[in-house]
């Protein structure tokens, strides 16, 4: 067999094994060990080809003994329950298409076959991640970087590889480098690539030509040798938390930059949270973070947004980080990230119209319960449960509340019944019956909120009884106008019947009912308004006062009504009605302007004008929240008090939310509807909120602050004005004390405040010292003690105490001390010894200085040759000063034998004069001694033996024995002369 065939043999074997694994998967493939069967169905992820029957949901999630389980969003849930209407989060895709009622959710599929490695125990930096029940591994496919054995183009020297890694599939296993992160290896992530291997095999097997086979083998060999495997620079993490560290320079191939991948996979139902603990990149290096688990990677962040302390969250349980560095020696940079798993949650469910929702938890296992208002029925599941998955989701779609066609309402106290589809149009061929039954001993009252029937055979009948045979008290066939005062039942029942034919539709009807006791008036009602009463049960004598919501006006009734007639209690006036009228004037500082008859459709051919007026030094902000008018209708805003003022804006047709600001204290609003336009539907018109605001050429007026005052730089708060806030003694400014009016007419900072000072300011450190503090925040009573370093002296008080002062802020008991270099007194200069010298010749010597002493020739130094000025208070010499004594014969003969002096070096050779002095000086001394004795005896006897002439004797001192010279000439060692300090 040729060498080329030998090279081709491993490739053929690998392809054969791969093909077998794809065609005939082994038993249990794609199913993790420990995967159990529930309700006759496996918990493995389904495929897109499988249908979506309403089967029992089975999940791979364990019971909710979860790691890193954060507290539930209690505050968020409470806030959401208090709101009337909540916006749902945007729907997120689920990777489990077989779960019940997931009709509209996209399906995440694997683009390539996956070979699942056997799972092992997951590891992390913190130790093993263990659960009570081992979770099965899910099959997940994402893009994989090139690995060993994959042929990719090799960048040239200095060229940076910036192409994305080839598409592939990888399977994160529970085993991973959660503790330190281990390099990627083919055993961890199986992949298939489009390398053209199949074509190569076909060519080599189909042809018997050896030359062709050799050529093919050469091509394959060349492709493999050009690979720059990034194996040491790719890691797979599967623990619940860990660290991502930048690779070292040793990981970088020669002349090629690094292209590193960090793959993170946590347990489904958790997301990946990455925190930037440190990052320092070189110019040209990139770091990208993506969320995985969907059909396409989700970009989360790159090096432009990665700052220290930043937190990035992936909405799925997989994430990837890619680091690309420059070739050596420029790179690589450094970074240190920490990741951890966090519990994912379902989105907040949408509140149904005419209903409410109550949520226990948004995390897996939580539930949402729905209910509808009276007169509406729930269509859909009443209870939803949050299921654990790659992205948690509700087990069903949110229900809706629809108006029921008929029904029995027993113990009816207060509520409403509406026609099917209300406030929209009802459908054809309806026959609906409602039976209202009040509690025992009470009667019913009906208010007509709205009745709109088609002008044909559609009919509304209200009967004073409990069946279709009861006498009618209202029949739409016979009554043209609705009774403003409503209807009263003679017993505890009302029977309502609505029938429609096969042609024509309308909005239908809305009736409000109230039950009331005998001897009392019924509860009044005003649509789009409120009322206050003097008694909650409305007995005789009760008074009620009505008011309308902003934008509405009271009509057709009295503002105050009273319950009268004890025998047959009733209101002395009918309840008023609140309607949105065409035109009006207002001087309120805030309010609402509504289209005529809102929320009902406005009429055709209307021309309405509203005027809004505020104080002269104020301006008006118009907040147009709803604008749904016909294309032939016109809404115009004038910046003034009449139609000749400047036009702020003119609009036709529907438009989104926007705002307008006036330059005057007045605004005029004109609405003109098209006479020939068709009738619009419900909630067609406009809603405009207006507010009084400060002048729009100045910043808003700043208020005074307690315990302080403000000082503006000029009276008018125009652009550039500076306002300075100061506090009274004993208080300090919290926040910025200087605010500036900016170009956008807003203040540069938030309003500060004055806070009572209860602590002293930090006195600070003292140079060349250390301090001991009793409390780090320096409250009243705290102490600070300063201790100087060695060689320094404290000047001032060493102990400071924080004292409270009623009239001002707390203050330290003394000023901060100082540590000065210790100044020591010098030593006084010593006189040179007699027959000797000292060096240096100074009058004063600083502490630490040294003085050297020496003797003249023929004298010996007794004492220390060098003494030092010892620092102190006061400074003193280390030893007494030495003296120079003359040499003596005793010293010369002190030795038991004469030691011949060693000849010194050539530099210290004795000259002849010194040698003569050393010999004759003792002789002279002896002669003087003999002469002295002689003269003594001669004087004692009165005459001289030598008969010398008498002369006046000269005085002389008595020579004592101490005057004898010691002779050091023959001492062992060198001879001692002036300047030699040794004896």
UniProtKB/Swiss-Prot annotation:
Compartment(s): Cell membrane
Residue ranges of domain CUB in the record: 405-516, 582-693
InterPro entries: CUB_dom, SEZ6_CSMD_C4BPB_Regulators, Sperma_CUB_dom_sf, Sushi/SCR/CCP_sf, Sushi_SCR_CCP_dom
PROSITE patterns: CUB (PS01180), SUSHI (PS50923)
Coiled-coil regions listed: none
Residue ranges, annotated region (Disordered): 80-132, 148-194
Cystine pairs: 346-386, 372-401, 405-432, 521-563, 548-578, 582-608, 699-741, 727-754, 760-802, 788-819, 827-869, 855-884
Keyword Transmembrane helix assigned: yes
Keyword presence, Hydrolase: no
Signal peptide (from-to): 1-19
Bias kind Polar residues: ranges: 101-112
Compositional bias of kind Pro residues: 154-167
Positions annotated with a glycan in the UniProt record: 278, 388, 425, 530
Matching SMART domains: CCP, CUB
Chain segments annotated as transmembrane: 915-935
GO cellular component entries: dendritic shaft; dendritic spine; endoplasmic reticulum; neuronal cell body; plasma membrane
Superkingdom of source: Eukaryota
Domain Sushi: from-to ranges: 344-403, 519-580, 697-756, 758-821, 825-886
Pfam families: CUB (PF00431), Sushi (PF00084)
Membrane topology qualifier: Single-pass type I membrane protein
GO biological process: regulation of dendrite development; synapse maturation
Family: Belongs to the SEZ6 family.
Role of this protein: May play a role in cell-cell recognition and in neuronal membrane signaling. Seems to be important for the achievement of the necessary balance between dendrite elongation and branching during the elaboration of a complex dendritic arbor. Involved in the development of appropriate excitatory synaptic connectivity.
Protein name, as recorded: Seizure protein 6 homolog
Source organism per UniProt: Bos taurus (Bovine)
